[in-house]
Amino acid sequence: MYVGLGSRSLPDPDAALSVVRESLRRAGLRGIVQSGWAGLDGGEADDRILTIGEVPHEWLFPHMAALVHHCGAGTTAAGLRAGVPTVGLPVLADQPFWASRLVEVGVSPGAVPLRHLSTDRLADALTAATRDGRYRRRAEELQRIVRAEDGAGRVAEALPSLV
């Protein structure tokens, strides 16, 4: 399970990490927490959480059972390319939109807006994302579609008509 909030800073990272740790325990999962700007530095070491710094998402995500993230456009796209279910923790701007799209396309059991983060909500979402195979199957289906796209090629074709 990957947990990361990108460039999002938190008023109380220790409280958020405590919720993540307990949610993982309740769901019977272990997590890799990317500290990032949120300051999720891992706190007290245990067998539930490994804290990491910067790691390329395209390398890490395919190895995860599911992802928990802020639903920024880049992280959302990386999750879709990896073919992994997601639990969104949206905060602001476009994040609620991307979190709702992940639910609509069937790769997420639901979002837990960061302002409503609780152990019960996150543990339930983690359990659904990792134990209900529909999310994994749909994520893998979308992965094949996304990887077949040639976005750069399409841009190269369109550029001459724009100049």
Residue ranges and their predicted role:
Residues 1-66, 75:
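Donor-nucleotide binding loops and adjacent catalytic segments primarily
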Residues 47-163:
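Nucleotide-activated sugar donor-binding and catalytic core shared by glycosyltransferases
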